């Protein structure tokens, strides 16, 4: 299997909501993390559990390739976007029924043609804005939030 075929299959496993599709792609001692995992996940079973929570919250979720993948024999960086509607609660966040588009990059380490380590990167703040949980960047709401968090107080006093 080529690197492109491997990553296409990885994206297909997420989009197809097929828990059995991950095992042939991943090393037995897979290490996975993304902004929604509190701790790194170890093994395919933990990855599948994470995927099933996301599939339940975003039943129409899919990953789409967004650009060229950068790869050598050991590493690959795969840009994509995640699209889906938040229909059920996720980690205590009630369903918002909002559609999100998150640009992501999966940075992967390969071992014998399988995924050994995978780190997913996306902007969690942007996700929260799209879900209506946090104010948009540059808005009055964001400025108020920053003041409440203690940012900008010195500048306000000095003016």
Question: Which stretches of residues belong to each language-model region?
Answer:
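C-terminal and inter-domain tail/linker signature
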Residues: 1-159
